[in-house]
A protein has these predicted regions:
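N-terminal beta1-alpha1-beta2 module of alpha/beta enzyme domains
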Residues: 1-56
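Pocket-flanking alpha-helical
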Residues: 47-50, 74-82
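Alpha-helix-loop-beta-strand connector modules within alpha/beta enzyme cores
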Residues: 2, 45-66, 70, 117-128
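Glycine-enriched alpha-helix->loop->beta-strand junction motifs that scaffold or abut catalytic
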Residues: 31-33, 55-59, 87-89, 153-156
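Hydrophobic faces of well-ordered beta-strands that scaffold small-molecule active sites
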Residues: 4-10, 33-37, 60-64, 91-95, ...
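Active-site beta-loop-alpha junctions enriched in small/polar residues
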Residues: 11-13, 40, 66-68, 96-100, ...
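Aromatic/hydrophobic pocket-lining residues that form the small-molecule binding cavity
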Residues: 17-20, 45, 73-76, 114-121
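Internal, glycine-rich beta/alpha segment that forms the wall or movable "lid"
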Residues: 77-156
Length: 156
């Protein structure tokens, strides 16, 4: 997947679905090749990605980032494969461990050691069954890295 040197990161929570589609179309018309969408406590990034991909022609849509604590690894794999297949491989899955105050304070979940937790999550994703139709390419996964140990994992 090639996505050029310049993309856009945009927070869509304040926009309606029709306005989100128009914004993505505008971003695409301006020549940007990739649109990064975050995950907080608003719109589901996988659902939003599906909508934006369905309303653009060549724009790559990437989660930047999807929080691994918000969904089970097999569910993430299924979403990744489905989005890649329905968009002709224009979906890029970006994952991250988020931050302890968000995971524990906002979501009420237990925050684990970042690198070990991410490694286990990726292993569990890879081991998860998926029986749906796959795209012509293996969809890429990128991970957010805030330090050298996570950066080393990202390079694997």
């Amino acid at each position: 997947m090639k996505f050029g040197n310049l993309g856009v990161w945009f927070f869509f929570d304040g926009l309606s679905s029709p306005d989100s589609a128009k914004a993505a179309q505008r971003i695409e018309s301006l020549g940007y090749s990739i649109l990064w969408i975050p995950e907080t406590v608003g719109k589901n990034p996988m659902v939003l990605a599906s909508w934006l991909l369905a309303n653009t022609k060549k724009l790559i849509v990437a989660t930047g980032i999807a929080n691994i604590y918000h969904r089970e690894p097999g569910v993430t794999l299924s979403a990744q494969q489905s989005l890649a297949e329905q968009s002709n491989n224009r979906f890029l899955l970006g994952l991250g461990v988020s931050h302890k105050p968000i995971v524990e304070g906002v979501r009420g979940l237990k925050y684990g050691p970042p690198v070990a937790t991410m490694r286990k999550y990726l292993e569990d994703m890879e081991a998860s069954p998926y029986t749906g139709v796959s795209g012509s390419e293996v969809p890429p996964t990128v991970i957010a890295a805030l330090g050298p140990k996570m950066l080393a994992l990202a390079s694997e």
